[in-house]
């Protein structure tokens, strides 16, 4: 039986172009690897791979992908928000984590070995960086 802490990686996926979606998938995979290495957690990011099977621009397929992600989230111990921006899909995942009284943290890949606890949903608005200032 696996006794490692299971961490759900929450990072942006949706983007206007397929190239941007691919970049976001690579970013999610990087976060999975870093969280596993830095904290020893078993990290999950379904959105790092699902766009290879499902079209994020198709509403039905996007809903299916979000549903799958929520199912994976329900099997995790905590949620880690990666990056500086909260997308609409991330918002759904984060609200579910708070609803289930799951521990929620922020992680910035440039600030390794640090998880910042998020105790309240309102903190996320304070941490949000305007879209025009984002380079991820």
Task: Report each predicted region and the residues it spans.
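Conserved catalytic or regulatory cores that recognize and/or transform ribose-phosphate-containing ligands
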Residues: 1-136
